[in-house]
Amino acid sequence: MFQRIRTYCLSGIQAIPVSVEVDSSPGLPGFTLVGLPDSAVRESRERVVSAVRSIGKVVTGFRTTVNLSPADLRKEGASLDLPLAIGLLLASGEISVREPSRFVFLGELSLDGLLKPIHGVLSVAMTLKNEREAVLVIPKENVKEASLVENLKVLGVSSLAECVNALIDDSFSGGALSAPGLHRKSLELNYDSPDFADVVGMEGVKRALEIAAAGGHNFLLIGSPGAGKTLCARCLPGILPEMSDEEILES
């Protein structure tokens, strides 16, 4: 049986969509993984098989081929463990899920089926923000990060067993969080920045910094220790406009 599971890989800080294509068929048992996987991805088979066994399922009695598409993109990291496990369970007929294309899976599995936090969840969440029906399934430790993207459906799970039960029961709608987005009050600085009004003299430096702030220009302060470079630089945020939500997320 053939199954396609949605996930993402990172290229720098950019999230690239990846399809985990799993084909399990009768024949001499074997497992082939293609699609430019790195060492961590190639080793995922052992983690996934052990994690699947821990929840009482078996996916090893088939001739299995896994393709990570696009095939010309190098896949790195252990975040493909969860989508690979779900793909194997579906392709082998161990579980059945309604409309699996709704879900995007990310997560590293331990041998006992527990999910470990991963990197790059925010980049993936920002990519999915315009997909109203998409449900991002991630480790619970990453839910707070993903919830910074407003109105994204996020399902946090702590183990493979919890993920499978939610998918089988189609109970994700009750457990999925509709992300509230940014709360600016939680991002406010906890210290008082100095103000340009408190800086005596140095009119030329202040004027240059005001021009740099207004036009978004770079600047370089050079001078002897104690000349006021650090003080002026610390005053600069006070005259900058507030960042938009998108700018905050990108920073």
Where are these regions (language model features)?
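Peripheral, non-AAA+ core regions of ATP-driven protein-machinery
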Residues: 1-234
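Beta-strand segments within the central parallel beta-sheet cores of soluble alpha/beta enzyme folds
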Residues: 64, 249-251
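Post-Walker A helix-loop "phosphate-sensing" segment adjacent to the P-loop in P-loop NTPases
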Residues: 238-249
